[in-house]
Amino acid sequence: ISRAVTSDLFLEDVFKLIVMVVAKVTGVDICSLWLVDEECSPPKIRLKATQAIEPEYVIDRSLNMNEGVVGYVATTQKPLIIANVLDCEIFKEKEMAEKLGLVSMAGVPLLGKKGKISGVLNCFTSAPHNFSNTDINLLTTVANQAAVAIRNTELIVQTKIIEEELKTRKTIERAKEIIMERQTLSGDEAYRWIRKRSMDSRKSMIEVSEAILLSNELY
């Protein structure tokens, strides 16, 4: 669990960095990053990062794939420009826009391998802004680079988790062999012994196993 949390926090930092860089490069006031969550059935699109918005706005915000401007961009896989979000029927966050003084918006899709939609990048301005073709091309380029960066980061995290899992299994297996020899137990009995020690001491099985290996080296 701790490794999963750590990996999530690492990805969260990458998401935050993306929106900060996009906002700085493009000169927009607010940038938000939404990513497709395919673990849901049907899939949803979730807000992963934004800047200059109250933290409570970000917590567990998700939309259906065909809902709002985010869903529109995700479904059509095409950029969307809105001159005034308060006048846009499909824009769902009018209360938030009024509160923050947001006016114009441009949304572009994040396309992954083989053109598969992986998310949406939304950019807002606090004054009326006519997003030009140059603006959209820049946002599209940045969005595609972000999609690659996110995918590469996910692969790195997955690799690290697999490596840690293999290391954990190997350590527990070695500890189990030591307990089998010391106490003349079967493999299953030794595993249950380690698990009970873990529960009784409120330590993880890897911590108990590492302690067993250390004691074996000392004696």
Label the model's feature ranges.
Residues 1-5, 10-33, 69, 193:
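Amphipathic alpha-helical coiled-coil segments that mediate homodimerization
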Residues 7, 11, 15, 66, ...:
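The cytosolic transmitter module of two-component sensor histidine kinases
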Residues 19-23, 30-61:
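GAF sensory/regulatory domain recognition
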Residues 44-46, 55-92, 98, 106:
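Regulatory sensory and allosteric helical modules in signal-transduction proteins
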Residues 52-53, 119-130:
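Short beta-strand-to-loop transition segments that serve as allosteric relay/switch motifs
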Residues 103-112:
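A short, aliphatic-rich beta-strand micro-motif
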Residues 140-147:
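Allosteric cytosolic regulatory segments
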Residues 155-218:
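Signal-transducing coiled-coil/dimerization helices and immediately adjacent hinge/linker segments
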